[in-house]
Amino acid sequence: MAASFVIVIVISFFISLAFMCYVHYTSRQRRKLHGYGHEKAVRLPPGSMGWPYIGETLQLYSQDPNVFFASKQKRYGEIFKTHILGCPCVMLASPEAARFVLVTQAHLFKPTYPRSKERMIGPSALFFHQGDYHLRLRKLVQGPLGPDALRALVPDVEAAVRSTLASWDGNVSSTFHAMKRLSFDVGIVTIFGGRLDERRKAELRQNYAIVEKGYNSFPNSFPGTLYYKAIQARRRLHGVLSDIMRERRARGEPGSDLLGCLMQSRAGDDGALLTDEQVADNIIGVLFAAQDTTASVLTWIVKYLHDHPKLLEAVRAEQAAIRAANDGGRLPLTWAQTRSMALTHKVILESLRMASIISFTFREAVADVEYKGFLIPKGWKVMPLFRNIHHNPDYFQDPQKFDPSRFKVSPRPNTFMPFGNGVHACPGNELAKLEMLVLIHHLVTGYRWEIVGSSDEVEYSPFPVPKHGLLAKLWRDDSVSVETDGCQNGDNDDNGVAMV
């Protein structure tokens, strides 16, 4: 009896001790989350954390995400907290804050993605890392994406543009899908040069499309789900890439394209060659980064030009002069000519600002960080809101107006970041701009198009594009290339469809 009593006392003691430890731990966490007890008595930014577990995720996805963030900024200011996608977050909507996170104190904020995304792309992909590995790999990737490489790539980009427009000619198609095809083809030629046969290209295209469909699906590995199919397709992609690398080694010709540079690079740990897995992860990462973002911007450019006929005619005149200098389009575009498209370049910059395809980026605080008297706790997600900055009237007058002339003067520092900022800014931004310039040249000098249905609604897949990908009919019209004077302000057919 006495022994039983002692056992009960001992068990009760340990239960009480465990409960006290739990209470102490949760109390500390509570104080930390609410900013109490911190050495400098800083507090969390204002904001709302929403419901337990789900936070404000439902509010985010029940409306336009940009409206959600804009309303939060209007209520709480340029730094505020929320809880979305299962994570406590601090949102930053000022140029100074974005620079703080992405440039001056970038070492305190690491790139962060869900594990399911890393598994889909590959854990060794450039944009999942920071530090020495990231810097070595970024320097390597910038070579095949630099000015010298792009100068040699102009004919290939032009061929891809011509092919895309020719396949669209006379048909009603989703602009976004057409632009995705273009961006994929440009990505393939950048990665593999002109050395990839059609069978391999078809294998890559087919399996990448499956990976893309499953990328934003719920990470359920049960057979038959989109995620499961995507993981299987990702393995097949790795197999195709491994075969290509093996064939190149057998020939003793790794090549000077992006794949060849990765195969020969000693960007691995301790100066070692990259493994085939590391090379494959980065190739798939480049394909992913190069396609949907660029295709989304190209889709918006087609819409913005359509919606502003006087601007379209001015762009058409600029491009017609270049076409005339190329013997009516019989000679290819040159790198120098793409550098001379002043108005067209401003249209691209304004499209990047207006659409703000990359609305924000994710980082994670690796330590408790203080910014302007507020605490950003270790482990919290930090999101610089690019779109909020791009649409702030303090930095861009009348921000909802599409006005390329605003770029006659350079924007204030850190107010225009369509490709990010700092060491993690997109290394392929100049390739993307080249693709846009060449597409616009051939689109406005050789074709007319009409938008089918409404183009005012926006959908996210995952980047913002007009609903249904902007359905449009395109047809060849060589007469437009000689209209260097005057303005056609657009016509309306009997069905009220604007034609340009």
From Swiss-Prot:
A biological process from GO: abscisic acid catabolic process
Location of the protein in the cell: Membrane
Residues annotated as binding heme: 426
Pathway the protein acts in: Plant hormone degradation; abscisic acid degradation
GO cellular component terms attached to this protein's record: membrane
Disulfide bond positions: none
InterPro entries with a match to the protein in the record: Cyt_P450, Cyt_P450_CS, Cyt_P450_E_grp-I, Cyt_P450_sf
Membrane protein topology class: Single-pass membrane protein
Residue spans crossing the bilayer: 3-23
MF terms in GO: (+)-abscisic acid 8'-hydroxylase activity; heme binding; iron ion binding
Catalytic activity: 2-cis-(+)-abscisate + reduced [NADPH--hemoprotein reductase] + O2 = (+)-8'-hydroxyabscisate + oxidized [NADPH--hemoprotein reductase] + H2O + H(+)
A Pfam family annotated for this UniProt entry: p450
Origin superkingdom: Eukaryota
Entry EC number(s): 1.14.14.137
Keyword terms: Heme, Iron, Membrane, Metal-binding, Monooxygenase, Oxidoreductase, Transmembrane, Transmembrane helix
Cofactor section: heme
Function, as annotated: Involved in the oxidative degradation of abscisic acid.
Family: Belongs to the cytochrome P450 family.
Name this protein carries in UniProt: Abscisic acid 8'-hydroxylase 3
Organism per entry: Oryza sativa subsp. japonica
Lineage: Eukaryota, Viridiplantae, Streptophyta, Embryophyta, Tracheophyta
Gene coding for it: CYP707A7
